[in-house]
Amino acid sequence: MSFQDLEAGRGRSLASSRNINGGGSRQDTTQDVASGIFQINTSVSTFHRLVNTLGTPKDTPELREKLHKTRLYIGQLVKDTSAKLKEASETDHQRGVNQKKKIVDAKLAKDFQAVLKEFQKAQRLAAERETVYAPLVHKPSLPSSYTSSEIDVNGDKHPEQRALLVESKRQELVLLDNEIAFNEAVIEEREQGIQEIQQQIGEVHEIFKDLAVLVHDQGNMIDDIGTHIDNSYAATAQGKSHLVRHQRHKDQILL
């Protein structure tokens, strides 16, 4: 079963696979890896769309929060799938493991490597855009009845108007303080988000390096399988040739 099979709709979640099968068999581990890759690929597509929205009129704090949650979700999927793939690889080195399973696991490792590359690209683009652009926020404003421009400020007017002007000024100062505090919070949140992206980029990079070693190791194992098959085929062909020559020699003796 390959990653392409799962894209046709036969993927299952990691959790459901564990609950149904118990995760105890070799096949379950391979299924978990395939399911994880499918989920990562789907989530990375969503992540790409969200990243492309950064810097547009749709770039809001709500979108940044959704982007943050999606990024964390993918990161956890990557860790879980990487662990399962290592488990499958260790199993493949045991004696008596089906050669077909080894080949399937090797293909899944390459699929995992490809989808990780896409996620890394999206991560770097997200870090770049979140650094450059700030989300659009709706700033609070005073009701029109409180704007000082509409109030007669002459001292000989009614005390009610003077009281209204004082209240208007107070409201403006409160809003100004709130806006400053809000902007500081937005800046702090952006900086924290960028730091989290950089940290996750580092984590995924380490997983990618480990995966490259695993893919190389599995490639050697697949080459060994191919060599073994070729040698077996050559030995079989040679054996048949010997039998034919022996039969011909026997026939000549009988004649």
From Swiss-Prot:
User: Which UniProt keywords are given for this protein, alphabetically ordered?
Assistant: Acetylation, Coiled coil, Membrane, Protein transport, Transmembrane, Transport
- Please share what else the UniProt entry notes about this protein: In cv. RLD, the 22 amino acids extension regenerates a typical syntaxin transmembrane domain. In cv. Columbia it encodes a protein that has no terminal transmembrane domain, but that is however not detected in cytosolic fractions.
Annotated function: May function in the docking or fusion of transport vesicles with the prevacuolar membrane.
Positions with biased composition (Polar residues):
14-31
Write down the superkingdom of origin.
Eukaryota
How is this protein named in the record?
Answer: Syntaxin-23
Q: Where in the cell is it found?
A: Membrane
Outline the segment boundaries, as ranges, of region: Disordered.
1-31
List residues of the t-SNARE coiled-coil homology domain.
184-246
Family the entry assigns: Belongs to the syntaxin family.
Q: Topology in the membrane? A: Single-pass type IV membrane protein
Lipid biosynthesis is among the record's keywords: no
Query: Transmembrane helix among the record's keywords?
Result: no
Residues where N-acetylserine occurs?
A: 2
For this protein, the record's PROSITE patterns field holds: SYNTAXIN, T_SNARE
What's the main place this protein lives? membrane
Subunit comment for this entry?
Answer: Part of the t-SNARE complex. Interacts with RGS1.
| Pfam families (UniProt xref) | Syntaxin_2
Q: So which tissues is this one expressed in?
A: Expressed at higher levels in leaves, flowers and stems than in roots.
* SMART domains the record matches: SynN, t_SNARE
Q: Which BP terms from GO are recorded? A: intracellular protein transport; vesicle-mediated transport
Q: Write one Gene Ontology MF term.
A: SNAP receptor activity
Which GO CC annotations does the UniProt entry carry?
Answer: membrane
